[in-house]
Design a protein with these regions (language model features):
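Short clusters of hydrophobic/aromatic residues that line enzyme substrate/ligand-binding pockets
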Residues: 78-80, 166, 228
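A short beta-strand-turn-helix
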Residues: 70-87, 115
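N-terminal low-complexity, Pro/Thr/Ser-rich intrinsically disordered segments
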Residues: 49-76
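Extracytoplasmic/periplasmic mature domains of Sec-exported, cell-envelope-associated bacterial proteins
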Residues: 65-69, 134, 168, 236-239
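Glycine-rich, flexible loop/turn motifs
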Residues: 74-76, 162, 190
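Structural alpha/beta surface segment adjacent to cysteine/selenocysteine redox centers
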Residues: 85, 90-181, 186, 213, ...
């Protein structure tokens, strides 16, 4: 009896170790499977996913000089919020960039409700259409043409919401003309603006400015001159904005 009883603890320990091993293995396999599904669905974390498209690899950006910051603030394509706000958020964007769309889908409305519409932040948009996005430059021009009829933001939203419909289209100009009519614009005036290339040079000027200050990927943001690169979560913006508001 004594001998049989003395072996039971050893058996129990083996069983416990085996159980722990199996549970741990099952957890690891489950975690890997969940992560794989998230990555396939495009819902992975920012750590595991790229947040920006770049024209070429660039070193980490530093804050803008006062001179650069004033140049970035001058004559933007669009601005919203209190012009006397303590903080200005500048966004360099590309309408065909998937990461710019991610920012539009996930973060823009939160910034609007918490900072821009409350008068804490002025929001400025500048164009940075990357050369490998075939319709990005034309889209930037389309938004500006809509701006002639006070519909810049409406076209801005429309372009991001329908990005996959026109991004690789060979008839993007026709698509944009249709958007103009949907938004209630004067179609003839819009078409004349877009076909005539009224804002081609203005978009090119924004591109040149972006290159000059070292913004070579999209989206790129500056909070009072401090850079924030990529489609970052609201928390990343809050850290810079709240610090600037103090």
């Amino acid at each position: 009896m004594t001998e049989k009883n003395s072996k039971k603890p050893a058996v129990n320990i083996v069983q416990i170790i085996l159980t722990i091993f199996l549970v741990g293995a099952a957890f690891a396999i489950g975690s890997m499977w969940t992560e794989l599904k998230l990555l396939k669905s495009g819902k992975g974390t920012a750590v595991n996913q790229p947040t920006q498209e770049a024209a070429s690899p660039q070193p980490e950006e530093g804050p803008l000089s006062d001179e650069q910051w004033q140049e970035v603030l001058a004559d933007p394509v669009y601005s919203e919020g209190d012009e006397k706000a303590q903080v200005t958020l500048v966004e360099f964007t590309d309408y065909q960039c998937p990461f710019c769309k991610r920012h539009f889908d996930q973060t823009e409305d939160q910034l609007q409700s918490e900072y821009i519409k409350t008068g804490k932040v002025r929001w400025v948009i500048r164009d940075l259409p990357l050369s490998f996005h075939q319709n990005a430059h034309l889209a930037a021009e389309a938004a500006r043409c809509a701006g002639d009829q006070n519909k810049y933001k409406a076209m801005h939203d429309q372009l991001f919401e329908t990005q996959t419909a026109w991004g690789e289209s060979a008839t993007a100009k026709t698509v944009f003309s249709g958007y103009a009519k949907t938004l209630g614009l004067n179609g003839a005036a819009f078409d004349q603006c877009l076909t005539g290339g009224k804002y081609k040079d203005a978009v090119d000027a924004d591109l040149a400015l972006a290159t000059k200050i070292g913004a070579n990927g999209t989206p790129t943001f500056y909070v009072n001159g401090q850079p924030l690169v990529g489609a970052q979560p609201l928390a990343a913006f809050k850290a810079l904005i709240d610090a600037a508001l103090q």
